[in-house]
Amino acid sequence: MKNLAIFDLDNTLINTDSDHAWPQYLIKKGLVDAAETEAQNEKFYRDYQNGCLDIDAFLKFHLAPLARYSKEELAEFHREFMAEYIIPHISPMQRMLVQSHQMAGDETLVISSTNEFIITPVCHLFGITNIIGTQLETGSDGRYTGNYIGTPSLKEGKITRLNQWLAERGETLQSYGKTYFYSDSKNDLPLLRLVSEPVAVNPDAELEKEAKEKGWPVLNFK
């Protein structure tokens, strides 16, 4: 029976938060108002860390710049972003973790609250093609509208989106032998409690506390 290995992305497979880093890249490029974007970015990041993020307000802020450029321009920006802000924050151990599951024949999947535009090329670095992120709306002109569609994959939303993905494949979690989920954040406790093999990676204080209480493995890649 095949196993399913699910990974969070930010601060789990990469030692940074791509959602937080993207506005920093836009500021550096001079593509957004620096002071306003920095203030908003830091506020939303604190809220996320504290488990009280207003996902609608955050996505309105975070997705607006995507609507200003063509997908070709955004792809070029993303290549620069990856080289400067993402690749330097991936350790050999994180790559080896994914490879160990791939070599064992496990199905691998990333579920992230970060949007698909940002996470898809990052997941491809790990050879992961099953990717669930917050979905973006595309207009009739082929550009992103700045809106999202469906359920954002945050907190319980990760379970909703996982179940949708499984249903599309004619599966449930019970279709797999072991189900792993690797995450750093207390925001992911709903899904961590659902799988058979929860693993805390670079955990925040609340997740580390629960992991120790329940005997979950704890990995540190930072």
Curated annotation (Swiss-Prot):
Cross-referenced InterPro entries: HAD-like_SerB, HAD-like_sf, HAD_hydro_SerB1, HAD_sf
Record field: catalytic activity: L-histidinol phosphate + H2O = L-histidinol + phosphate
Consequence of gene disruption: Deletion mutant is histidine auxotroph. Complementation of the mutant with hisB from E.coli restored growth on M9 without added histidine.
The protein's annotated pathway: Amino-acid biosynthesis; L-histidine biosynthesis; L-histidine from 5-phospho-alpha-D-ribose 1-diphosphate: step 8/9
Cofactor: how bound: Binds 1 Mg(2+) ion per subunit.
Keywords: Amino-acid biosynthesis, Histidine biosynthesis, Hydrolase, Magnesium, Metal-binding
Binding site for Mg(2+): D8, D10, D184
GO molecular function: hydrolase activity; metal ion binding
Keyword Lipoprotein: no
Cofactor(s) this protein cannot do without: Mg(2+)
Location of the active site: D8, D10
An annotated GO BP: L-histidine biosynthetic process
Known EC number: 3.1.3.15
NCBIfam families the UniProt entry points to: HAD-SF-IB, HAD-SF-IB-hyp1
Family of the protein in this entry: Belongs to the HAD-like hydrolase superfamily. SerB family.
Function in brief: Catalyzes the dephosphorylation of histidinol-phosphate to histidinol, the direct precursor of histidine.
Protein name: Histidinol-phosphatase
Source species taxonomy: Bacteria, Pseudomonadati, Pseudomonadota, Betaproteobacteria, Neisseriales
